[in-house]
Amino acid sequence: MSKTAASSAVDASQAGTVKVGDMVVNRMGFGAMRVTGDGIWDEPKDKEACIATLKRLPELNINFIDTADSYGPEVSENLLREALYPYKGLIIATKGGLVRTGPNEWHPCGAPKFLRQEVLMSMRRLGVKQIDLWQLHRIDPKVPRKDQFSEIAAMKKEGLIRHVGLSEVTVDDIKEAEQYFPVVSVQNLFNLVNRKNEKVLEYCEQKGIAFIPWYPLASGALAKPGTILDAVSKDLDRSTSQIALSWVLQRSPVMLPIPGTSKVDHLEENVKAAGIQLSSEVFAKLDEEGKSEDAKRQEEEKKKSS
């Protein structure tokens, strides 16, 4: 039985690697949503801190960075270029397909001409001739899927996009998209206490698709005193969010978490999770408690909707 332990090193490469198409990246990435203003809108309050955080990424061996044209909008992509261009040794993934109308307001738009504009503008802001990984942020229910997927396939064929990913999708969504292009990544909600995307994760494992969980640090009520999460946290002198993140990493070899922040100290705290090794016994206990919390969440959602 493996022993639960924590390394003192702050190095994303401790998490191992995962393939995203033909690209191999360290399995601890970074989500650049938080280097913006409140409500993921406008410029950040402390731009210098955000730039310093972004510049720290390659020093910690983080080589997969996820952003979106809607973060700001445009702000996140612009800051990435300012801090890290020409991205030596880095894979920059971005997303498109959402319209912003204000803070915390997001609306799907899958019109083919709009998607093409999104790709071209992201290329311009990032200063690249090809986007490493472009992800459809949301499938637009008001636009025929054939139109959305065909346009994405065309842009890939033209060389504007190297690889294609999807976000917030079902297994059936992935299978439908795969009729038009290879899907190399899926970005869905997943964490210790929210398992609604287990079937999607299983499909990704079968197909060798990188699974990018958003909101990977969540631990809900398990962060309270007396839980196994609390006990492991105290034993290793690590935060409950670090333990929750280490559980996500160990849940599957295709997992590629991208915790984000606008501060260097928080970034380093997150990366330390890459050096935590949970024993099989501790992992199983966390898994069991997490499933229990997820069941409670689902029950509460049913009550609210009834």
UniProtKB/Swiss-Prot annotation:
Coiled-coil intervals, chain numbering: none
GO MF terms, alphabetically ordered: aldo-keto reductase (NADPH) activity
Enzyme Commission number, as recorded: 1.-.-.-
SUPFAM superfamilies in alphabetical order: NAD(P)-linked oxidoreductase
Location of the protein in the cell: Cytoplasm; Nucleus
CDD domains in the cross-refs: AKR_AKR13B1 (cd19088)
Keywords: Cytoplasm, Nucleus, Oxidoreductase
UniProt keyword Membrane present: no
GO CC terms, sorted: cytoplasm; cytosol; nucleus
Region span, Disordered: 287-306
Pfam families: Aldo_ket_red (PF00248)
InterPro entries (UniProt xref): AKR, Aldo-Keto_reductase, NADP_OxRdtase_dom, NADP_OxRdtase_dom_sf
EC class: oxidoreductase
Family affiliation: Belongs to the aldo/keto reductase family.
Listed name of the protein: Uncharacterized oxidoreductase C215.11c
Protein species of origin: Schizosaccharomyces pombe (strain 972 / ATCC 24843) (Fission yeast)
